[in-house]
Curated annotation (Swiss-Prot):
It comes from the Eukaryota. Residues 57-72 have a biased composition (Polar residues). One of its GO terms (biological process) is meiotic drive. GO terms for cellular component: ascus epiplasm; cytoplasm; endoplasmic reticulum membrane; vacuolar membrane. It comes from Schizosaccharomyces kambucha (Fission yeast). Residues 11-29 have a biased composition (Basic and acidic residues). The gene is wtf19. Homomer. Forms protein aggregates. The two isoforms can interact with each other and with themselves. High sequence similarity is required for their interaction. This is Meiotic driver wtf19.
Length: 414
């Protein structure tokens, strides 16, 4: 059987030959192609603009001839072997990397491995310096190891590069997942923190509102109580001064303030000592109170009541003076003021308050004295009852100690 040679021609070659030699009866003669202005396209260029080969064949039905009567060309063995060899060689050339690139990439790990050692030896000034037999042997062994590693990397280039690529890919995916998880976690943390801060701000605002509300109510009550107290004070003063002369009362209070200022000024200047200040303050207060009572021309029973209240006020003054004197003698070093200054102010305010209170409610000091006596009596009675109970407890303990031993044994058997 003879080997016949048939030229390999594809349908694309036939189409090109047709386009070159034949004229399409439907489309007419080929137009001239002007490449300068680009206004006229190449002949039958619609087939070139189609990306799908099926669409290209649809426009030209003679492009892919599937007639069963057409017999395929008889290819020879030589042509088949040459075609297979060309395809195999072209595929190998496409899949393999260039030789220099393989050498370069294989040498990079060796270079990276030796750079730290060279840098360290250079830093220690020991690179190829004073090398002996052992050092050169170590150097040769190291070079041999590096050469073996280089050869291994070059021979197994495809394997380790794919492994490195997979490692890099896995690392990148892992880092991406870590970044994603971190971002999500941070977003969740920010969200939770924002909600927590919002709740804290809400609770704080509510608490502040409650505090402001309570404070406002408390201040309103304080203002109310203060206004009521001032109103009562005004009422007390108006009732106390109802039957006396207004001009005389004003003069008396002005004289009282002048006397007190002179008294405290003299005491502060050192011209009066403690005892003189006590006597002067007591006498001044008594004189002023007596002047107020005697200048209004009140009935005798009212005068007697005022004198009684004045005596009670003087008694309270004496008690306060004794207490202040004792405290000053014990804690005098811890006070900035001296004793007579404190006593003078105490006497001034106490006398004024008690006098006005006695004028508003006659006999209140007497009732206060009786109430104080009752309280002291109650306290003393409680102390007496406590001592009586303690005495009874000790008496019962002594009675138990006097029981005979025989009676105690009988009680134990029972």
């Amino acid at each position: 059987m003879k080997n016949k040679y048939y030229p390999v021609r594809t349908s694309m070659d036939e189409m090109n030959a047709k386009n070159d030699n034949e004229i399409d009866l439907e489309k007419g003669p080929l137009p001239e192609y002007n490449s300068e202005d680009g206004s006229t396209l190449p002949p039958y260029s619609e087939n070139l603009n189609l990306k799908d080969p099926k669409q290209m064949g649809a426009n030209n039905p003679n492009l892919f001839n599937t007639d069963e009567s057409t017999t395929p060309p008889d290819y020879g063995e030589d042509s088949l072997s040459n075609t297979h060899r060309e395809n195999h060689s072209s595929g190998t050339a496409d899949n393999s990397s260039p030789f220099l690139i393989k050498l370069l990439i294989s040498f990079i790990p060796i270079f990276v491995l030796n750079v730290p050692a060279v840098c360290y030896l250079t830093y220690k000034d020991a690179l190829f310096k004073d090398y002996g037999k052992d050092e050169w042997v170590y150097f040769g062994v190291w070079c041999a190891i590096c050469l073996m590693i280089f050869i291994s990397l070059w021979c197994f280039y495809e394997t380790w590069t794919q492994a490195v690529a997979q490692c890099v890919k896995v690392t990148v995916i892992f880092l991406a997942q870590c970044i994603k998880v971190t971002v999500i976690s941070l977003a969740q943390c920010v969200k939770v923190t924002a909600i927590f801060l919002a709740q804290c701000i809400k609770v704080t605002v509510i608490s502040l509102a409650q505090c402001v509300k309570v404070t406002a109510i408390f201040l309103a009550k304080c203002v109310k109580v203060t206004v009521i107290s001032l109103a009562k004070c005004v009422k007390v003063i108006s009732i106390g001064l109802f039957n006396i002369r207004r001009e005389m009362m004003i003069i008396i209070w002005i004289l009282w303030l002048i006397i007190c200022c002179i008294l405290f000024g003299c005491v502060k200047d050192g011209r009066l000592n403690f005892n003189k200040a006590l006597i002067c303050s007591t006498c001044t207060i008594s004189a002023v109170l007596f002047l107020i009572v005697s200048s209004v021309c009140i009935p005798i029973w009212t005068l007697w009541r005022a004198l009684s209240g004045m005596l009670q006020v003087l008694g309270i003054h004496g008690i306060i003076a004794v207490l202040v004197n004792g405290l000053m003698s014990l804690f005098g070093k811890h006070f900035g003021w001296r004793g007579y200054e404190i006593e003078g102010f105490v006497l001034f305010f106490t006398s004024s308050a008690l006098f006005l209170y006695e004028m508003e409610r006659p006999g209140v000091l007497k009732r206060l004295r009786n109430t104080t006596g009752n309280v002291i009596g109650y306290i003393c009675g409680g102390i007496e009852d406590a001592f009586r109970r303690i005495k009874n407890a000790f008496r019962g303990a002594n009675d138990n100690n006097n029981i005979p031993l025989g009676e105690m044994d009988v009680e134990g058997e029972v």
